[in-house]
Amino acid sequence: MTGRAAYRIRLGLVALLCGAALAACGIPRSSDVLDGRRVGDNVAPRARIVVNPPAVGSPPDVIARDFIRSGPAFQETGDDQQVVGRSYLAPGSVDLWRPNALTTTVYDSRTLLKIEPLPSDQVRLTITAVATIDETGHYRELPPDTKASTVFGMTKVDGEWRIKLPDDGFGLWLNTDDFDRVFAAYQVNYVLTAKKELVPDVRWFPVGPRLPTALARAQLAAVPAYLGGVADTAIPQGTRLAVDAVPVDPTGVATITLTNSTQTLDPTRRRPMWAQFIATLRQAPGVTAVAIEVQGIGKIPVSSLPAAVSSLSDLGFSLTPT
């Protein structure tokens, strides 16, 4: 088999995989066919999600249940500028709740969240899980009737029951209805080998103020294994966000500040690197253009282009049709 023929086969496989991923971007609940949001569509800002703090005198099972129910509001702050879900936790567990960094488990909204008491002030929570979203945003559908469970310790804080999370931390449990409100599918883009085209990898991220940061962080990661040999990234290995935030100014310019390295400053990498970031970050609501800076140096220019670029065509790139 010639190299060109092998390349065509690999590219065809990528197209099939991408198409399958695009087709699987909803969580099935019935046999009805419903119109849904397309992957990569610019999603309107979500409505604010309001949840209640713990009620005085609530028993352990109610505290555990209401903590899980507070999960969809993990990006919201109350009047005291604190995330309400944290008020269900014992002080030593606040930093163990990492909804942005650990696995999100999606459970069937038609099934019950089962909570059973255990000895030594503990409760076990069990759900019928339908999918997981890992820390990189990859969605994995689970076999039917998959059960997921965890154990929370319970302790009294100022006379009220509060949760002691597992030592390895806890992410999110969201029912299917809340998942649809909080998460959306996006494309993280990579450069097709020897071409000025980008191919997407589908990820799921929370829709909210930190979406540009989540998309940028995902773009910095290595190329997924299934795209190996077909696509590459122009972003040097080991490059990170210099600050854990991608601010968006009032004109819609998202500024990405990267850690310094010789490869990051390589002029041959700038156009494809910029193309990847533009294609990925412009999916975030309000982002119209992208500027790239290097820590300690400032904006990295590309010949004949402005400091902030808004179009792939300005860079000579395009998206692979899916």
Task: Describe the residue ranges of each PLM region.
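Bimodal "functional hotspot" detector
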Residues: 19, 26-322
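Secretory targeting and sorting signals
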Residues: 2-28
